[in-house]
Amino acid sequence: MGSTVDGEKYIRNLASYIRSHEKRFARAPYRAPNHSIFSDRPVQLQLTVHHLYYLLTKFEELGVNTGPLNIRIENLHSETFPSDYTSFLNQSPKKNDFDDNMSLNSIVTMGSILSNVSSVWSIFSTAPSEASETRNKQRILAILRYIYSCFTKLPAISLVYNPKTPLISQYEEFPLDTAVPITVFKNLSSLEIRGYDIRSIFGWDFLSTTLKSLILHHCDLADLSEVLIKLVLDDAELYRFRSSRQTYPQQPNSQPCEQHPAHANLRRSVSLGSKDYLKSSHPPVHKTLSQSVLVLSKDGNASSSGGTENQSANSSSSLMEKDAILSSSSWSQLLYLRCSSCKLKSIPKNVFLSLQSLVSLDLSGNELTEIPYALGELPQLCSLNLASNKITGCRTFYHISLSHLQILVLSRNHLTSLSGLENVPSLEKLDIRDNSITDVVEFRRLVGNTNFEEAYLSLNPFTKTYSSYRITIFNYFREYPGSKDIMLDGRGPGMLEKMYLSEKASAPERVISLNPVNQKSHSPAIKSSSTLRKASKTRIVDLSAPNSAVFSKNASGGDTSSNVSLLNGSASEEIPQNTESGQVFRKKIEMLRQEAGPEWVDALMKESVVKHKFRNKDESV
């Protein structure tokens, strides 16, 4: 039997601890911006299920609804699973070195003396003691109100089993085999459970809508769907029953049929004296702890022991007939999930369908033999930890797509090959320490990944057989154009290693390829350009005569005097200067500029038109 502590003393100590760490509790879900020893690092409040149960019973004295405290759990206590339940039946009597008769006499003598003293003292201190008890009770209630107020605002808590923690006196055996509600933490976003059966926590339907981080360590999970699907549906729809992993025999007349895996083997019970039962139309028979147990067999029929109500049986059977479909809000905010050392052997498909926002997943310390195919249901997954399992290969990545995966931890497994990792182009960091990889050539599978930065690979057989494995791996990545030197076991290439490194492959030069013009798509443009070309005017300069003019000739061959176009100053420079007629024409234009001024163009035009008419008359004659 462990040590105990007075309940009121525990309440005072807890209130003092919370009051001195209020700010650090408020920052519990977040990381501290710096790691200075002077900064207030975030702290999570740690409780045991035993102490939480005691506090909830005290909160009920305030008239606060803390949730049901009578949800029984079948087969909770096992040899491999710890709990706060304390039994005095198997304790062997201690050997005493003195006679029992003498001890009894001494106890009787001391008892008589103490009774006489207490009777005399009670005469003088009856009234003052009653007043002090009243004041003490009021102080305890005020402290409880403060603790309850803090519980409703706490963003993170940790339920950790610790056998060395003193139990509350007169509550040593509680919570027995009942589930403890956690709905009093209304602002909870981070929950950590260590060493407890997850069925001992009630309120998973509420937790699935608020949690952003869930840590389950050493919780002995039979299946991951038990916490992500089963308990959420059980707490939301059955409410008064608790699932059990035990397989129950079918009734002789029942016919076997299939059921949904999320609702298999349900067995829960509720006390007949509970508030939930008293609300129904049937009065309780006895106010005892769990006098009726509802058993759901595999065929979906409900059989009762001790007079279970038909209403509960009907609701239970209706749940068995429904599909395991969670609401859209269930686990929609969960970003980090850790289920480490929970004895998981496999991950069923469709178990992660509701975790569309999950960024980090930790399944280390389990008994997985392959990378689960269900990981393909996590589109936002960036970090995956599968350390300390029994995984032999990575070929699952050929069948699933994890486009955002950046960190992969596969240390302490049985890997013999890295086949499949070439299908994870976003991978940046890889940890494969303490595996069974014998050939360094396996790292060529990662060469084409330009995002890859760091690898941890110590304690593999090839690190002993290949003395220069680091240089070999560095050169593998240098062969690929555009790649960079990676880090191996936290270190880049050393000074001596750089002497044996090959030159980096240069990136190929960019070749700008001109795509041929699509004639079909650009046919209208070609047509329009041809029409413009037909309508354009051709400039003709007659340089045979000294008094020549520039006129235009349309495409049809007709000469029109209205379409005469004169050359400007820049165009006049294009006239060949080595001919005598060209020089004469230039001098003529310069003389017109000096005499006519800005109107020299009009004068030249009139002169050229007149000369052209006279020439036509002479030709006609």
From Swiss-Prot:
Classification via Pfam families: LRR_4 (PF12799), LRR_8 (PF13855)
Cellular component aspect of the GO annotation: cytoplasm; cytosol; nucleus; vacuolar membrane
Disulphide-bonded residues: none
Gene3D superfamilies assigned to the protein according to its UniProt record, in alphabetical order: Ribonuclease Inhibitor (3.80.10.10)
LRR repeat locations: 333-354, 357-379, 380-401, 404-425, 426-447, 451-472
Location in the cell: Cytoplasm; Nucleus; Vacuole membrane
Listed transmembrane segments: none
Keywords: Cytoplasm, Leucine-rich repeat, Membrane, Nucleus, Phosphoprotein, Repeat, Vacuole
List of residues that carry Phosphoserine: 269, 271, 274, 290, 292
Sequence segments annotated as region (Disordered): 552-581
Entry-linked PANTHER family: NISCHARIN RELATED, SERINE_THREONINE-PROTEIN KINASE 11-INTERACTING PROTEIN
Record's protein name: Uncharacterized leucine-rich repeat-containing protein C926.06c
Organism per entry: Schizosaccharomyces pombe (strain 972 / ATCC 24843) (Fission yeast)
Species classification: Eukaryota, Fungi, Dikarya, Ascomycota, Taphrinomycotina
